[in-house]
C-alpha cells in the first residue's frame, strides 16, 4: 500500500553518524572509536567488528548522498538535545525521509509498484532468474532484496524465543512498533536456497513501549523514555535492572528485551514530579497519583 511504503523507515526520526568535527546540525565530534565503543556496550560485545566499523565509517559520508536525494536535516527538538552531538534529525521525520526517496526514485525513472508483494523467487544454480507477484513472473538481470526482517512474523518469533521457565511464550505478548509487513517471506526463501545466515535471531533492536500501544505501527511516539529518570518494576513489584546504568540514548534499545524477560512481559516505570518535562512524553498519558499507595492502586487497575 502506498500509505505504508518505506517500512520501518517511516517511523524513524534521526541518524546516528560519525563525524570528526562540528557539522551543520551536529555539535562537537563523534569519532569512530567512541561510536564503536558505544555499540560494543549496547550489544554486550556480541557484534561483528568488521561489519560494524564499515557501517560506522559510511555514516560519516551518507548524509551528503541523502541530501542529494532531497532529505533535509534539523537540530534536535526539545527533549532530545542530549543527542545533538551524535544524531542528525530528519526534518519532517521518517515520513518526509521516505517521501523524499520516492520522489527521487521517480525522477530517476524507477517504476514503483504498490499492492505487489513478492511471493517467491526463481533461483537456478544460485543465480536469480525471476520474481513472482502472484502469477506474474518478472525477470531481471539482478535482484536486490530490501524486504526487511521477520519481526512481524509471530510464528517465527515464537520459534526464536521459545517458551520460558514460567511456561510463557514471550513472543505472544510482543507489540511491534514498526510495520506489520516484515514477515520474513523472502528471508526464509533465501535461507532455503542456501544463503548464509549470520547473527542471532533472538537479538533485536527492542525498546520498551507503552502496553496500550497498537499491535503494529505505533511508531516512536509509543516509546517509554522516562526509564532512566525513575525506577522500573515488574508486575511483582521487583526491580530487575539498573535504570541509570548509562546515558539513556545508549541504553534504551536494551529495555525491550529486559521487559520481555519479566512475568507477563510487562513492566512499570515510576517517576516523580521532578522528572516531568525531562523526557519525550509518549502518546498515552501516564497514571498520576499523590501517594505511593494510591500509585499502587492505579497500577493494579492497568
Predicted regions and their residues:
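Conserved N-terminal/central alpha/beta ligand/cofactor-binding core
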Residues: 3-111, 117-120, 156-159, 163, ...
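Small-residue helix-packing and pore-constriction motifs in hydrophobic alpha-helices
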Residues: 17, 21-23, 175, 287, ...
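Hydrophobic alpha-helical scaffolding
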Residues: 52, 87-95, 173-180, 222, ...
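Charged, often glycine-rich, active-site loop that binds/positions anionic groups
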Residues: 84-94, 130, 213-221
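Conserved beta-strand-loop-beta-strand element in the redox core of flavoprotein oxidoreductases
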Residues: 121-137, 143
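Glycine-rich loop(s) and the adjacent beta-strand/alpha-helix scaffold that form part
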Residues: 138-210
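An anion/pyrophosphate-binding glycine-rich loop and adjacent beta-alpha core
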Residues: 183, 187-189, 193-296, 300
